[in-house]
Amino acid sequence: NLIQFSNMIKCAIPGSRPLFQYADYGCYCGPGGHGTPVDELDRCCKIHDDCYGEAGKKGCFPKLTLYSWKCTEKVPTCNAKSRCKDFVCACDAEAAKCFAKAPYIKENYNINTKTRC
């Protein structure tokens, strides 16, 4: 679920504040999303949005699904025991790893999505 996703990001990026830093970043980080991603981090969010979309098509509820995972040396790893839990956990884990590799560009936080996306 979204709280677990936030904790996965904290695992991959210790000291981060996901609910503040990523809730309104670029065109895809946060609720909704459209247009062309503004940078690598925003592309991570688009991939995550698309993954949640695929989970929904499989009959899963990604924003609500609780799963089991662990953090080892800044790497989130899934221990899910069902198809939906495994799929959603993988969406979140891959996104957290993607976030960790992408630069955070302050100018892309809270952008005008009407003109930039």
UniProtKB/Swiss-Prot annotation:
* Family that this chain belongs to: Belongs to the phospholipase A2 family. Group I subfamily. D49 sub-subfamily.
Q: How is the cofactor bound?
A: Binds 1 Ca(2+) ion.
Gene3D superfamilies referenced in this protein's UniProt entry, alphabetically: Phospholipase A2 domain
> Which PANTHER family does the UniProt record give?
PHOSPHOLIPASE A2 (PTHR11716:SF94), PHOSPHOLIPASE A2 FAMILY MEMBER (PTHR11716)
Reading the lineage from the top rank, the first entry is: Eukaryota
| The protein's Enzyme Commission number | 3.1.1.4
Instruction: Tell me the tissue specificity.
Output: Expressed by the venom gland.
The UniProt catalytic activity note for this protein reads: a 1,2-diacyl-sn-glycero-3-phosphocholine + H2O = a 1-acyl-sn-glycero-3-phosphocholine + a fatty acid + H(+)
Question: What protein does this entry describe?
Answer: Basic phospholipase A2 pseudexin B chain
Q: Which organism is it from?
A: Pseudechis porphyriacus
The annotated active site, in chain numbering, is 48, 92
GO terms in the biological process aspect are: arachidonate secretion; lipid catabolic process; phospholipid metabolic process
**Keywords on this record?**
Calcium, Disulfide bond, Hydrolase, Lipid degradation, Lipid metabolism, Metal-binding, Secreted, Toxin
Q: Any stretches that span the bilayer, and where are they?
A: none
Which positions form S-S bridges? 11-71, 27-117, 29-45, 44-98, 51-91, 60-84, 78-89
Enumerate the subcellular locations listed in this protein's record, separating them with semicolons: Secreted
Q: Which GO terms describe its molecular function?
A: calcium ion binding; calcium-dependent phospholipase A2 activity; phospholipid binding; toxin activity
Q: Which InterPro entries match?
A: PLipase_A2, PLipase_A2_Asp_AS, PLipase_A2_dom, PLipase_A2_dom_sf, PLipase_A2_His_AS
Residues involved in Ca(2+) binding: 28, 30, 32, 49
The principal location of this protein is secreted
Role, per record? PLA2 catalyzes the calcium-dependent hydrolysis of the 2-acyl groups in 3-sn-phosphoglycerides.
